């Protein structure tokens, strides 16, 4: 009952996320309750989700591009000591990248005349229509763990690009060449990885799930409010709209190339379990 008396079941305790799908909501004594698809009620607060979406292309762009992942002003040269120029750019603003230099321990991107932004605040899509080593067909998905981007290629043309969130240490997304082996429009995901299972999470109706490496999958993440930074248990999180686009494009058997141009992601197989959301 919505009053909280006589519970019929429970979701395991822990510090991880808890999300359920609901069909109705109500306030009882000022407390929010939602009705599950099973007819049961539970105390929970409705949640929104990020509406960011990537870019689809009819032809491959001529240069690299990317997104700002934070609000920031450009600098007149590639240095944090250089004067700020122009207006503050909003998070997820699209940028064109015309030059790249190493300065002060990171990449800096020239996004216009005398306008530079650091990797710390932006992410780059490396446009490369050459199939990665081992890719045998004319369709593939590339996941860049350093830049936290996903690109989709067909007939050696870039057709889609977006920001993602991949596995955070020590739950990295494993580099390698894989194939999508199962697609599910909705999936319930749960798990715990730490001793004592204090990090248990439970996620209902995870949308547009495409498994490619054991329990690691490409999927929508309605709970995530920041893309462009790692932080999953090994899956590759996309916005809801991006996951839907990819799910509709992808076929079972399509190849997924996961790589880290910085070489920082471990490749030792003993460091990788089955993965998770």
Can you name each region flagged by the protein language model?
Residues 1-3, 32-72, 110-140, 171, ...:
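Boundary regions of SH3-family modules and the immediately adjacent low-complexity/disordered segments
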Residues 2-8, 78-85, 240-246:
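Short alpha-helix capping/helix-loop boundary micro-motifs
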Residues 3-47, 87-123:
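SH3/SH3-like beta-barrel superfamily modules
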Residues 25, 39-41, 47, 100-102, ...:
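Solvent-exposed coil/turn segments that connect beta secondary-structure elements
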Residues 29-30, 68-69, 104-105, 143-148, ...:
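A short, compositionally biased
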Residues 76-77, 150-152, 187-191:
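Short, solvent-exposed loop/turn elements at domain surfaces
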Residues 81-88, 93-175:
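Cell wall/extracellular polymer interaction/catalysis modules
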Residues 130-136, 140, 160-163, 168-177, ...:
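Exported/periplasmic cell-wall-interacting domains
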């Amino acid at each position: 009952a919505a009053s909280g008396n006589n519970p019929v079941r429970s979701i395991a305790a822990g510090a991880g996320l808890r999300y359920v799908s609901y069909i109705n909501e109500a306030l009882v004594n000022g407390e929010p309750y939602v009705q599950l698809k099973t007819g049961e009620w539970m105390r929970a607060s409705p949640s929104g989700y990020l509406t960011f979406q990537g870019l689809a292309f009819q032809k491959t762009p001529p240069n690299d591009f990317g997104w700002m992942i934070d609000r920031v002003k450009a600098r007149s040269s590639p240095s944090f000591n250089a004067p700020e120029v122009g207006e503050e750019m909003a998070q997820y603003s699209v940028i064109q990248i015309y030059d790249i230099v190493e300065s002060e321990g990171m990449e800096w991107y020239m996004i216009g005349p005398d306008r530079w932004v650091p990797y710390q605040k932006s992410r780059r899509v490396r446009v490369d229509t050459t199939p990665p080593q081992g890719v045998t067909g004319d369709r593939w998905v590339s996941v860049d763990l350093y830049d936290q981007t996903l690109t989709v290629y067909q007939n050696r043309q870039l057709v889609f690009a977006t920001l993602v969130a991949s596995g955070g240490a020590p739950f990295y997304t494993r580099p390698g060449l894989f194939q999508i082996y199962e697609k599910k429009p909705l999936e319930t995901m749960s798990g715990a990885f730490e001793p004592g299972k204090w990090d248990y999470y439970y996620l209902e109706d995870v949308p547009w799930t495409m498994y490619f490496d054991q329990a690691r999958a490409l999927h929508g993440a309605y709970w995530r409010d920041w893309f462009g930074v790692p932080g999953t248990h090994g899956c590759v999180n996309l916005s809801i709209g991006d996951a839907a686009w990819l799910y509709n494009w992808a076929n079972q058997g399509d190849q997924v190339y996961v790589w880290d141009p910085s070489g920082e992601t471990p490749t030792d197989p003993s460091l990788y379990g089955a993965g998770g959301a």
